[in-house]
Amino acid sequence: MSVLQWVCLAVVVAATVVGVALFSRGVVAIVRTVRIGRVAPGRSGPVGTRLATLLREVVGHGRFQHRPVVRVAHWVVMVSFPLLVLTLVAGYGQVVSPTWALPLIGHLWPVEWVVEAFAWAALLGIVALFVLRLRISPRAAAPEVERRRSRFFGSNQAQAYFVEATVFAVVAAVLVLRGLEYALLSQAGETGLGLHFPLTAWFGGFWAGGSTAALETAVVVAATVKIVVSMSWFVVVGLQPTMGVAWHRFLAVVNVYARREPAGGPALGPLVPLTLADGTAVDLAALEDLPDDARLGAGAIEDLSWKQLLDTATCTECGRCQDQCPAWATGKPLSPKLVMLSLRDHAAATAPYLRATAAAGAVTEGTAAPVDRRAAVEDDPHAGVDLVAAGVIDPDVLWACTTCGACVQQCPVDIEHVDTIVDVRRYQVLMESAFPKELGGTFTKLERQGNPWGLPARARLDWAKGLDFDVPVVGADVESAADVDYLFWVGCAGAYEDRAKKTTRAVAELLHAAGVSFAVLGDGETCTGDPARRAGNELLYQMLASQNVEVLNEVGAQRIVVTCAHCFNTISREYPQLGGRFTVLHHTELLNTLVADGRLVPVEPGADAGAGGGTVGQRITYHDPCYLGRHNQVYTPPRELLAAIPGAELAEMPRNRETSFCCGAGGARMWMEESVGTRINATRAAEAMSTGADVVATACPYCTVMLSDGVAAVAASDGGADGTAAAGPGAEPVGTDAPAGPTSPAGPDRGPAGGAPARASVGVPEVADIAVLLRDSLRAPTL
């Protein structure tokens, strides 16, 4: 060995020892931080299902489906990482002997083909990702409003560029080494090298004229550079366990494996149950037995589960959640990404103190008698630090969330933002009684009257007045819900809100026309509890939900049809947690089946003039309700229903299906003022109006209310009669940033008929539920 080789060997050995040691230190720090979290039940099995899901996610990269370039680029870079580790191992041998190769597989041409193919692909992929980041990164000199439009706003760009530069340097070194190996073997008279160097022989040939000594020196230097760069990455990453853009390479595998849904799918639909520190679910029956020091929800960092802490460590700061968040898009301070980063940094700073205190208190001084570790931790000033009071999560951030699930849907590493935000809300509501003042009235109305409007139960059947047929009530007109085809769950909005009543009446008329027998509960209904649960009042939710489950079981409910997407999600996805298991259909699903079966027949344009066809020949755009679409994957039936209306033209908004933009009502936001930034409903209404649609079709009463008011607000701000000024996706309509007023759906004291009319003026698109549009398109004699 030459002097250079000895020097290079010493350098790579030292770099490796330091790199591996510091990287191991980082691993230990992350594991210890995650372990301060609470138990997260059900995250380990079934193993086979979870492994299959993990493999499918890794191979398919399904969360990147709307970004094909990023999908391919990220995939090849990701796959090259473990594949090219073999070249790193070979590099150590090349420092000692430039012609050294891995035993057995070192000169197998299939292996060499794979190495070269992925090396080139990774090089192109990392360049593409670098250019993309450079192109959409926020400009430092730009105003904040403009910088916020970048999904990388708030991300650590220096760390990201470091990671990308490291990948580029390592992959480039691999290719250079391959070319130098070709040149060395060519000088040695080897034949058939084209088979072994399929993608590097073309430039390796340029070096074949060099001397053997020079080529061997070049191999040693290139191998040393590759190893030192790799170990430098390990050093930097090991020293920064909060560097998610690097650590996600390892943590994402664990996070995806431990996802909430073992068979796949995002953590949407039902919320995780409220649990104690040991993972025991909290219900109404267990409240009396709770210890005095029990903490409900996530008030401090140690109240989060280990999976929630792993979520924060895994965040790669890609900003896809931020890019899709309706609150962030309308100028509010909530960014799901920044919430995760804030929790991550706080956990990393707090965990060492919590661990040290727990360890010190594990054994009484001078004895072997064990003591309560948690009690010892609670004496530490770093323990129990209120996440909101300490400024880790600002109240405006916490309460801006609509729980639409866009962040969860977009996250490529399965972070469960909504569950974490609601857990923090639970603590604030249940333990601190700290919540927006409007919610106080909503909670009271839910508790006393069983609906957020605060109206009497006897008014729940007012919507049926004037129908030319009787609506049977279970217990009065029919003995059991099992005696009819469907129990029609009307919901609070469908019973009390004037615009939603139109949907309720339309569904009843359509079911009657199709010969489907149904009955309602009348004053036996109460709110499903969705607004209480999303607002963090889990105990009020359980009170309402338990009452409903008991009633539904008593009346023998088997098949239930609902018009509200929130009721649909709660009854079908959350009531099973309380023992209520029913077959639940959204009205668009049932009506679509009835149309497909020929039991409902929309009229052709011009047929039976004056007898129907009120919406035919019109341009319709459809708004996907979050709790029907993203949370429950119901996208096709509503569109098939619209397609069944003769002459109707469907004009999709730019943001539709999985990427649909929230109306602003979810997460109990329907009952809170919206005084920060632009109104979400107006932004969505502007996007709908930009399609040139005559009708904005909805499939949820909350969406109908919010978009009706949004359309009216946009039309008023335009100042014109047509109200159809172009407004692209994400546009912020002028004049729609005022606080919610008496015509807004956001006030707790808003009456059942509050808000602007569905059609505010001539030329302004109508906002109507699909059921209303379908009913209007049928022949009058049918109804």
Descriptions of predicted regions:
Residues 318-321, 407, 665-666:
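Cysteine-cluster motifs in flexible loop/terminal segments that predominantly coordinate metals
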Residues 247-250, 263-266, 333-334, 420, ...:
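Acidic/polar loop patches that form or flank catalytic/metal-binding clefts of enzymes
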Residues 270, 276-307, 345-391, 636-645, ...:
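Short, charged low-complexity linear segments at domain edges
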Residues 233, 316-319:
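Segments forming glycine/polar-rich beta-alpha architectures that bind adenosine-containing cofactors
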Residues 325, 411, 707:
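Cysteine-centered loop/knuckle micro-motif
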Residues 173, 179, 205-212, 216-217, ...:
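Iron-sulfur cluster-binding electron-transfer modules in prokaryotic oxidoreductases
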Residues 2-135, 303-312, 334-340, 347-579, ...:
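Iron-sulfur-cluster electron-transfer modules
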Residues 1-292, 297-298, 337, 341, ...:
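Membrane-embedded alpha-helical bundles of multi-pass integral membrane proteins
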